[in-house]
């Protein structure tokens, strides 16, 4: 009899696991709804995802925004799921948006609508009701940049920004790799009002034959700026310039800016910038070649600074790529990421570049204020007044796992106010409006010795 009872118990457990796996898609479904509270920190498991190689170029992502009206955190995942969590880590609602990865997010000024971009066979842009998670409207990037699933060429809404009227400006993009290793690029900037009515697209009758990763908009100067970031410039490419300034009302090109490259690079690449100052008078950008630039609102260079000079050591060109550029009240911050070998990022480098994984802050007249150096890549930065919260992720050269976590910096002088460690690399960060709470998304990783560190988690820290 006891053997029969044991078999029944095991059978019930197996059926329960199968049911929970069907509902959650997680091999450890009991963790999907779990959270832990460690004093001033709350962590929530976001579900199973593949643990990626620590040293690979592309890596697990996550999206997070603070919703002041709800005192809550809007979280998007690589599993295609969108959550709203309160400040104690309690799930308010969850929405599964599709089969793709969520890759971009922006929230309306009244905090009623979230605009979410995904990478998938459709590449949808979603408008989501923040109160309940309902889909208000959607637009498929595949309609403007196409899709080639057989070649694993999927469209994405790679970046989103909004103006003061909550008009939405989105970069739709996909690339395809040919048999000879060359890349084909398809990009389009698309504008909508908050109800989903399309206002314009740029270019009107063709695609941008370059990688477009970033855009920003400003109401005071009436412009949208796009930056390009193609790996190489081919003779037959039409959209070869670095930045394109567009009339935000009509979608017509105002002017374009070609930022000349520095040796040994053949073109200038901007991936996490440029961004306008609030008054629209300035535009800050960081380049992959290691330069930080400040432009005026028309795209004229006011000054440039060498953050990370490409250096040749033992026949290898190494540099610390620049990525982010901002124009905020406290100054003009730029960031650099890991040290890379110019010939091939997968190749080792003789040394770390001394300017890697750093934030450089300048005054608007170009004078240097300070440098803050992290021990890993600053994956994302969010601001609350003159405080910056930074997600510190991987260092693919030193494998210093103690570097992972969220750091809070005083932008006035670069003082480190807080550091919250995570086991795995922190890939996204946000800070509350009052600066008292910080949240981040940790990702798992497989180390070179085969060990899995970290997990796909939301962390909420109370400062």
Stretch-by-stretch model annotation:
Residues 22-463:
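Secretory-pathway ectodomains
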Residues 1-13:
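N-terminal Sec-pathway targeting helices
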Residues 12-20:
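Sec-dependent N-terminal signal peptides of Gram-positive bacterial secreted proteins and lipoproteins
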Residues 3-5, 17, 57:
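Generic N-terminal amphipathic/basic segments
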């Amino acid at each position: 009899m006891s053997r029969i009872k044991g078999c029944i118990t095991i059978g019930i457990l197996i059926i329960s696991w199968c049911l929970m796996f069907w509902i959650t898609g997680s091999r450890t479904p009991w963790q999907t709804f779990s959270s832990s509270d460690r004093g001033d920190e709350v962590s929530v498991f976001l579900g199973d995802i593949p643990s990626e190689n620590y040293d690979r170029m592309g890596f697990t992502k996550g999206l997070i925004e603070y919703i002041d009206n709800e005192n809550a955190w809007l979280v998007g995942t690589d599993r295609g799921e969108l959550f709203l969590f309160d400040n104690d880590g309690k799930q308010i609602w969850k929405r599964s948006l599709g089969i793709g990865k969520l890759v971009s997010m922006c929230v309306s000024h009244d905090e009623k609508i979230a605009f979410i971009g995904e990478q998938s066979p459709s590449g949808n842009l979603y408008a989501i009701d923040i109160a309940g998670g309902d889909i208000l409207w959607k637009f498929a990037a595949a309609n403007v940049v196409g899709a080639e699933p057989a070649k694993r060429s999927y469209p994405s809404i790679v970046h989103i920004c909004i103006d003061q009227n909550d008009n939405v400006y989105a970069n739709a993009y996909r690339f395809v790799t040919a048999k000879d290793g060359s890349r084909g690029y398809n990009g389009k900037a698309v504008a909508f009002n908050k109800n989903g009515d399309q206002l314009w697209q740029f270019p009107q009758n063709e695609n941008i034959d370059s990688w477009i990763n970033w855009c920003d908009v400003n109401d005071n100067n009436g412009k949208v700026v796009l930056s390009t970031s193609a790996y190489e410039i081919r003779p037959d490419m039409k959209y070869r310039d670095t930045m394109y300034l567009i009339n935000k009302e009509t979608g017509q090109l105002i002017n374009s800016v070609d930022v000349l490259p520095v040796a040994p690079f053949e073109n200038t690449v901007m991936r996490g910038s440029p961004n306008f100052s609030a008054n629209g008078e300035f535009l800050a950008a960081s380049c992959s070649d290691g330069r930080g630039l400040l432009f005026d609102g028309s795209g004229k260079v006011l000054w440039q600074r060498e953050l990370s000079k490409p250096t040749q050591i033992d026949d290898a060109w190494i540099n610390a790529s620049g990525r982010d550029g901002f124009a905020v009240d406290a100054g003009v911050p730029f960031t650099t990421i890991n040290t890379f070998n110019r010939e091939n990022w997968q190749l080792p480098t003789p040394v770390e570049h001394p300017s890697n994984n750093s934030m450089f802050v300048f005054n608007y007249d170009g004078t240097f204020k300070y440098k803050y150096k992290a021990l890993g890549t600053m994956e994302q930065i969010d601001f609350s007044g003159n405080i910056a919260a930074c997600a510190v992720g991987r260092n693919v050269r030193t494998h210093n796992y103690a570097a992972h976590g969220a750091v809070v910096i005083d932008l006035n002088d670069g003082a480190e106010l807080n550091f919250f460690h995570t086991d795995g690399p922190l890939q996204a960060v946000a800070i509350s409006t009052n600066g008292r709470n910080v949240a981040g998304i940790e990702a798992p990783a497989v180390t070179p010795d085969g060990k899995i560190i970290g997990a796909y988690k939301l962390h909420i820290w109370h400062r």
